[in-house]
Amino acid sequence: EVANLAGGGAAGGIGATLYSLFNASLENGISMILNSVNFDTLLSDTQLVITGEGKIDNQTLMGKVPFGILQAAKKKGVKCVAICGIYSPSKELEECGFEKIIEISPRDLPLEEVMQKNNATRNIESCIIKFINSMR
């Protein structure tokens, strides 16, 4: 029963265990977090939300943070941009509603180099500046 439990995957192992042993309820993690910080209220005077993840692929659409933020932003009519280290494009991602998905890591650099704090910071800043300038 627990093996097929929605939300009981790798990140939900503890939740699935508590569910099976103590009849605990399972809640979507990003929904719980967004509700706890009143994210809808924070969006009231917002024009753009920038979110991110290490890798954006079809798994992102299965309840991960960027997709939860996108859904909340869409409900309020707020544009949402995602930044990521690696982007694996798909039709589903192209149609899900992100204004733009920006891959920040140059593919020709080794992962160790890309992950260095100075390089990562520079890559993020550069991509965000280019995106903002493209909006003008």
Where are these regions (language model features)?
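N-terminal loops that bind phosphate or other acidic moieties
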Residues: 1-136
